[in-house]
Curated annotation (Swiss-Prot):
Keywords from the UniProt entry: Antimicrobial, Fungicide, Plant defense
Organism lineage string: Eukaryota, Viridiplantae, Streptophyta, Embryophyta, Tracheophyta
Native source organism of the sequence: Hordeum vulgare (Barley)
Example of a GO biological process term: killing of cells of another organism
The protein, known as: Antifungal protein S
Glycosyltransferase found in the keyword field: no
């Protein structure tokens, strides 16, 4: 399965996914796709 994290805030956030790979800095409007087994 693939999960997509979308930062809909107007500021930078730090998203985390454990144990899928730690964290990711997301600027406003940025997305992060995470593949889970």
């Amino acid at each position: 399965a693939t999960f997509t994290v979308i930062n809909k805030c107007q500021y930078t956030v730090w998203a985390a996914a454990v144990p899928a790979g730690g964290g990711q800095k997301l600027d406003a409007g940025q997305t992060w796709s995470i593949x889970x087994p």
